[in-house]
Swiss-Prot record:
Keywords attached to this entry: ATP-binding, Fatty acid metabolism, Ligase, Lipid metabolism, Nucleotide-binding
Primary role: Catalyzes the activation of long-chain fatty acids as acyl-coenzyme A (acyl-CoA), which are then transferred to the multifunctional polyketide synthase (PKS) type III for further chain extension.
Transmembrane segments: none
Gene: fadD15
UniProt protein name: Long-chain-fatty-acid--CoA ligase FadD15
GO cellular component, one term: membrane
Length: 600
């Protein structure tokens, strides 16, 4: 199958917009708890009426600052409650939200401010505010900087005070003037291959995304469910899911404190979470390592295989009597503990940003947590394809979100069009023209659609490795397999214009400690100290051999190199959503790559 379309069971009207739902909820269900926010470490209820009042006050404050419809307003902050309130306020006055990751460098912030010509910026912390102040001479359009937290006056309080003298009728008029074709947000791409481009999304794009998600997931996105958002709201996935949840009256909480995520999950008790595959891989690998450290590695291995078998059997008419009995035993011994780590009530998750892997998907479903994989980009308002609760094929990213179409080009590239697809790049006609072909957006990803209409992503077009022998290799297949090993943190497949495929491997710091203990290694030894240790080499070699089973002999990894350090966002090898920056890795570890191909 080369093309598939899914019609929308809804319409988007001329004046439909994202902010309208804030005041609809206030009118229809004022006392319902739509948010919970952390105040002094306690999750505190926020009703629809309270949220609407805060958003209204912030919007009036923006009007008092002279923010006009179409003006760009930056949120430079980690994920937190105020992020969502400010976003809705910006949209309500007809302005355009411009997110910046809280980890961005001064040069990245400068470029976004200069290119977008933002007039107001919300800085989260003292350090964010200081960075922006130091850039003030090079960003003349920026008139106002307000601080969300830290030592400065609170941004929401300042807006409330400033907007007290503004007639509420002015906000009513702004809302009435909004059209679905109006710009809503400007999201800057990661810029791994040059200057970041501003991706323009309209109110219509976001409304299509929100309504499409609800159409596919009426049992996840419904009143009474609970969602804890911990991915960066600057990333389109977290923001789109948060908006869809708000629309469906899911109670939403926010945190950026990843180090204390498990205790927060235990208290918040979400029924659904949204994350990237690396988090699900990490949870699995940690559970496997903890079992191994406790001398129960064999039990966990059998439990994991039973979960996979049970899930696969569900796709073939259901598990038999013996498998059901085994599954029940391991549910008490293993799976229940895994669910408890996520708060005890979590029954489903949404995964996006990278492929999850079929085995991991089956494991989690078998353990009682169904993961619905999706696919999308900033240019598609988040998900353009997603697995459905009643139409799931693990290992795929599902079917098009209603109102959208997918096509596989002759060279295997995935093309998309429809309600969620963006209108173009900000002030960059050349890039916009290059991004489309006959009205279809060129995603840059390689994919396939099976006979049932399910989409599978096989890699990035620009990441395809062409060996010296002319063999095309998609690195993601091997890398996903390698990251499934509990001792491996990251893997980068190399071999462009080389005689064979190689790999750079980093070791998971937490798993490494347990491995040293089980293998009688010196407690204080670092990965660098043991990078050539025969036992460590043997363990990674076994993982490489297992990964190679997923590809042909010509595509298989012949040699690998263990790096002395792991990749992190702080050291520059990872994006805020934990994707590897291949160009950075290739430059930083050029000598290690060369060593793979040096003749011994």
């Amino acid at each position: 199958m080369r093309e598939i379309s899914v019609p929308a069971p809804f319409t988007v009207g001329e004046h439909d917009n994202v902010a309208a739902m804030v005041f609809e909820h206030e009118r229809d269900d004022p006392d319902y708890v739509i948010y919970q926010r952390l105040i002094d470490g306690v999750w505190t209820d926020v009703t629809c009426a309270e949220a609407a009042n805060q958003i209204r006050a912030a919007a009036l404050g923006l009007i008092s600052l002279g923010v006009q419809a179409g003006d760009r307003v930056v949120i430079f902050s980690a994920t937190r409650y105020e992020w969502a309130i400010l976003d809705f306020a910006i949209l309500a006055v007809g302005a355009v939200t411009v997110p910046i990751y809280e980890t961005s460098s001064a040069e990245q912030v400068r470029w976004v401010l200069q290119d977008s010509e933002a007039v107001v910026l919300f800085a989260e912390t003292d350090s964010h505010a200081t960075m922006v102040a130091e850039l003030s001479g090079s960003v003349p359009a920026l008139r106002e900087v307000l601080q969300i937290a830290g030592s400065g006056p609170n941004a929401l309080d300042r807006l409330t005070e400033a907007g007290a003298s503004v007639d509420p009728a002015e906000l009513t008029a702004r809302l009435a003037a909004l059209r679905s074709t109006d710009p809503a947000t400007l999201i800057y791409t990661s810029g791994t291959t040059g200057r970041p481009k501003g991706c323009q999304l309209t109110q219509s794009n976001l409304v299509h995304e929100i309504k499409g998600a609800r159409a596919y997931h009426p049992t996840l996105l419904r009143k009474g469910e609970r969602l804890l958002v911990f991915l960066p709201l600057a990333h389109v996935l977290a923001r789109a899911i948060s908006m869809a949840a708000f629309h469906s009256k899911v109670t939403v909480g926010f945190t950026s404190d990843i180090k204390n995520l498990l205790p927060m999950l235990a208290v918040f008790k979400p029924t659904v979470v949204v994350s990237v595959p690396r988090v699900f891989e990490k949870v699995y690998n940690t559970a496997e390592q903890n079992a191994a450290n406790a001398g129960k590695g064999r039990i966990f291995a059998i439990a994991a295989q039973t979960a996979v078998d049970w899930s696969e059997a569900c796709d073939r008419g259901g598990p038999g009597l013996l498998l059901r009995a085994k599954h029940a035993v391991f549910d008490r011994l293993v799976y229940r503990k895994l669910r408890a780590a996520l708060g005890g009530n979590c029954r489903a998750a949404v995964s996006g940003g990278a492929p999850l892997g079929a085995r991991l998907g089956h494991f989690y479903r078998g353990a009682g947590l169904t993961i619905y994989e999706g696919y999308g980009l900033s240019e598609t308002s988040g998900g353009v394809a997603i697995s459905q609760f009643n139409d799931l094929k693990i290992g795929t990213v599902g079917k098009p979100v209603p109102g959208n179409s997918l096509r596989i080009a002759d060279d295997g590239e995935l093309l998309v069009r429809g309600g969620v697809v963006f209108s173009g790049y900000w002030r960059n006609e050349q890039a916009t023209t290059e991004a489309f072909t006959d009205g279809w957006f060129k995603t840059g990803d390689l994919g396939a659609v099976d006979e049932d209409g399910f989409l599978t992503i096989t890699g990035r077009k620009k990441e395809i490795i062409v060996t010296a022998g002319g063999k095309n290799v998609a690195p993601a297949v091997l890398e996903d397999q390698l990251r499934a090993h509990p001792l491996i943190s990251q893997a980068v497949v190399v071999g462009d214009a080389k005689p064979f495929i190689g790999a750079l491997i980093t070791i998971d710091p937490e798993a490494f400690e347990g491995w040293k203990q089980r293998n009688s290694k010196t407690a204080g030894a670092s990965v660098g100290d043991l990078a050539t240790d025969p036992d460590l080499i043997a363990e990674i070699d076994a993982a490489v051999k297992q990964a190679n089973l997923a590809v042909s002999h010509a595509e298989s990894i012949r040699k690998f190199r263990i790096l002395p350090v792991d990749f992190t966002e702080d050291t520059g090898e990872l994006t805020p959503t934990m994707k590897v920056k291949r160009k950075v890795v290739a430059e930083k570890f050029a000598s290690d790559i060369e060593a793979i191909y040096n003749k011994e």
